[in-house]
Amino acid sequence: MSTAREVFSSVDQGETWEAIGIKSRWPLPYARGLAVKSDNPDVLYAGCGETTTGMNGHVLRTTDYGANWETLKLPVQPNATIWGLSTHPADANRILAFSLFGEVYMSDDAGESWHKIEREFGEIRTAVWLPNL
């Protein structure tokens, strides 16, 4: 679960929640979207930024359920906070990340490399993949 300044995890089906402490682990303090890798629940992706609209954003990845995070290198600096992410249900290595102000980045290798989609949109709030497309 993501709130403005923290990410929480639960190991008991949501009965209790524990903060993972992003202030000491993330390069920017504002937490936004989360996505889980469809074939490995230990791998999570997160979007962050300076503030809600922010002039800066990052995509982060953890491979140990949030204990450690790495910043993934995007081809250009996003124009705003990375607002959300979407993992493809049929291709676990395919991920979309998008900024609040319309930039879209795609990875076909689980976040190892990214390319920016040429077309930009207005404010993007969410994105989903259809499993058979």
Regions found by a protein language model. Name each.
Residues 1-133:
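Extracellular glycan-interacting surfaces
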